[in-house]
């Protein structure tokens, strides 16, 4: 048998191949090897896919993974153009004494100079000077001494920094390029050179940003106190590499303020540092266990995270489970659409919690659903705080939106290369985002902050 080879037998149009024992073993080992290779490739692909499709990543972050479809919208016949009340995009003309008359010189077709002017066309343009160069100022300060207390001091004018070679307006421009335009240091210096004939080294730009961050330290500390005393907070965190190690950016968002802190921990010690042990406000968050530290707070767990988890269930029972949870979420939104009394809210909270308990008790019998039912059960009393208390959102979208800018910065710069860089970023990014939420003029606020603390 050991030396036998395979034989072919023909039955009509079918050919059956009889393999020898050695050939069967050889083929089996080959298939087993291929199977192991395919398994490893599958695991690697699934691991890569989990970076984009997981319960902690919102669908908006992965537009390329969304199915392409055309949404049908029934529109009544109407005139083309902007809807009634639309302000339009045409810029209003401005009064100016600057006039330029362009005269004809020759026919563009035959180059003849024999032509006549039959009319004129009016237009208005806004233009920058061909060369915008920084102004160099030699500054002389009086050194004064008080005749009463004998204190020696330098004269100030609230517009000229006491130290450094760069003025307030230039510092504001550089901060705009870094934090609003998201420019990296090298490209920022290239832009300043091309646009303003201002030659700066990347190190100089970095020093200006650090000086601005130090000027904002007092306001940043004040912002911390506002967040600590806020009655309602939306909190989220995301990873960020610092000197090759995994750190975390925490976002604390209230109705009017945003605080970013960058720490080497994702634990409850960060919550204790920022909010204190006795924080008793309302916190909207995901189910990360660090938030359990806030024992005196009212916690609202994020329904967006939960529904993303349940949507991954592919079995029949899993799909039914997801539909039940989606119906509860829709019920929350419908209930909160109207004004409710405290009594109505407590009654609805009790009813909804009991209903959710019943649902997870039923679906916990299915193996695929167990991870989601446990996820819910660990925080059962925290899923309907938005029903019990008015003005609370059922999702943590506010915090996720607040931290999105930091995620974009992470994609651009990759990592912070110094501990100082984390302090600079968290200070200026927090202040700028807060001014944006409060609809303040960022340029004016930066000028005010820098003038107050540096001049």
Regions found by a protein language model. Name each.
Residues 45, 52, 107-108, 146, ...:
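Mobile genetic element proteins and their domesticated derivatives, centered on retroelements
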Residues 117-119, 154-157, 242-244, 260-262, ...:
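Short helix/loop capping segments that flank catalytic or ligand/cofactor-binding pockets
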Residues 186-197:
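DNA-recognition alpha helix
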């Amino acid at each position: 048998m050991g030396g036998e080879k395979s034989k072919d037998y023909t039955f009509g149009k079918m050919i059956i191949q009889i393999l020898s024992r050695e050939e069967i073993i050889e083929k089996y080992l080959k298939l087993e090897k291929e199977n192991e290779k395919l398994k490893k490739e599958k695991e690697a692909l699934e691991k890569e896919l989990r970076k984009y499709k997981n319960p902690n990543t919102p669908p908006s972050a992965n537009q390329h993974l969304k199915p392409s479809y055309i949404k049908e919208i029934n529109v009544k016949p109407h005139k083309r153009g902007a809807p009634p009340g639309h302000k339009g995009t045409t810029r209003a003309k401005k009064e100016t004494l600057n006039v330029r008359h362009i005269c004809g010189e020759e026919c563009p077709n035959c180059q003849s100079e024999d032509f006549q002017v039959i009319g004129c066309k009016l237009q208005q343009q806004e233009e920058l000077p061909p060369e915008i160069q920084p102004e160099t100022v030699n500054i002389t300060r009086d050194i004064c001494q008080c005749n009463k207390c004998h204190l020696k001091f330098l004269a100030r004018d609230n517009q000229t920094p006491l130290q450094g070679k760069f003025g307030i307006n230039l510092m504001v421009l550089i901060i705009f390029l870094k934090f609003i335009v998201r420019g990296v240091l090298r490209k920022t210096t290239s832009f300043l050179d091309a646009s303003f004939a201002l030659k700066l080294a990347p190190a100089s730009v970095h020093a200006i940003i650090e000086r601005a961050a130090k000027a904002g330290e007092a306001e940043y500390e004040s912002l911390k106190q506002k967040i600590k005393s806020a009655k309602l907070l939306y909190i989220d965190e995301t990873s960020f590499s610092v000197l090759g190690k995994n750190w975390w950016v925490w976002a604390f968002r209230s109705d009017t303020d945003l605080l970013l802190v960058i720490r080497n921990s994702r634990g409850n010690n960060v919550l204790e540092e920022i909010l204190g042990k006795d924080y008793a406000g309302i916190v909207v968050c995901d189910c990360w266990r660090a938030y359990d530290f806030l024992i005196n707070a009212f916690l609202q767990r994020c329904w967006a995270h939960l529904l993303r988890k349940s949507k991954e269930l592919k079995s029949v029972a899993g799909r039914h489970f997801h539909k039940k949870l989606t119906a509860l979420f829709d019920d929350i939104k419908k209930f909160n659409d109207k004004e409710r009394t405290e009594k109505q809210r407590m009654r609805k909270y009790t009813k909804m919690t009991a209903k959710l308990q019943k649902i997870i008790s039923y679906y916990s019998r299915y193996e695929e659903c167990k991870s989601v039912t446990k996820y819910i059960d660990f925080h059962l009393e925290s899923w309907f705080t938005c029903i019990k208390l008015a003005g609370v959102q059922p999702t943590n979208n506010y915090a996720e939106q607040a931290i999105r800018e930091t995620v974009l910065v992470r994609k651009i710069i990759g990592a912070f290369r110094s501990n100082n860089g984390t302090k600079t970023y968290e200070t200026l990014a927090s202040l700028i985002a807060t001014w944006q939420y409060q609809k303040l003029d960022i340029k004016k606020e930066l000028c005010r902050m820098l003038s107050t603390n540096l001049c």
